[in-house]
Amino acid sequence: MKFLITGDIHLSRYAQDKVEETSNLPERLHSIRNALYDMGEYCYDNDIDTFIIAGDIMHSKSIIYSIAQEIMLDFFDQYEDLQFWIIDGNHDLSGKGTGAISSLNALRSVSNVEWISGTASVDSNKFFVPYSNNMVEEIKNGKADILISHFGLNEGILNSGISIISDLSMKDLIGKYKLILLGHYHKPQEIIDKEIALYYVGSPIQLDWGEKNDDKRFLVVDTETCEVESIPTTGYKKHIELNVTNSNKTEIIKQAEEAKEQGHYVKVVKTETVDLGIENDFMVVEKIDRDITNRGITSSMSQSDKFKKFLEIREIPEDDHERYMKKALDLVDRCEG
């Protein structure tokens, strides 16, 4: 048997977005809905009857927006022939303690949804562990072919490219599970060796510029073989960042124009001084390395004087100096304390 899995949907109001004319929805809600329905159609077209969401259907934690809840419930109703398995993610909850309330309580009355909240649940060879204050213990003590959960892993990578220290690492999972399917980190990624395979399915759309250029996807899993197939998600506006130099200027401008015609968000980044002439049509930012050595900053200077000189070098407006200085000095005090 095969199932489809996604996660980190992050339905919210997105009131600051432009309204998509065809649906009268904020742009991100429109894109999320498109991606969800494309996944539902994929299930129908490929005889898949089980659809799993690995946490974070909602975005705003203790706030439930009616427009977000309506899209969620309409989706489950539209695909009434599918069986959905849903676990809580951290954004679905009002907190992490035992008194946390889930924003997914409305799923109790949805006949084709199995909602798993609070404690772990086992179905055949699948072990579902929702986000909770005791999830780490449940995962370390559990055992199954397939683990489905929502947490950060030591070896996982954020969209920024860094890893953070977490309560779980690969050594806690090897020997207990063959395949691990996770929500929580939005960057699609996998860690695979001969003993275990771990996948962060990633968010189905690029939710903001922090997820720029990510190849978003959903996964299709064979429960008998634990084989995983990655399928690109479609139907959403992408955040595309293009780095431009004098040597690739013509090609980058062409790519930017094509992406804009397709309705995507486009940012052009200048990595060297280059005359583009497209600043009125595109978001253009400058990321040029500048030499700040030997500019009058010496070891004998006070911290305040060093910071002030640095702000001058970086051409920060003088009106902003006091604000930046306060933050920098506060940070130094905390580190030295």
Question: In which residue ranges do the predicted regions lie?
Answer:
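Conserved beta-sheet core of the metallophosphoesterase superfamily
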Residues: 160-227
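Active-site glycine-centered loops adjacent to acidic/histidine catalytic or metal-binding residues
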Residues: 8, 55-56, 89-90, 150, ...
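Short, conserved loop/helix-junction motifs that constitute active-site signature segments
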Residues: 77-81, 140-141, 170-176, 193, ...
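Extreme N-terminal starter segment of soluble prokaryotic enzymes
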Residues: 1-4
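Core catalytic region of metal-dependent phosphoesterases/phosphodiesterases
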Residues: 15-120, 173-177
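Conserved catalytic scaffold of divalent metal-dependent phosphoesterases
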Residues: 88-172, 201-204
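Short, high-confidence coil segments that cap the C-terminus of an alpha-helix
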Residues: 48, 142-144, 263
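Accessory, non-catalytic peripheral segments of nucleic-acid enzymes
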Residues: 45, 222-337
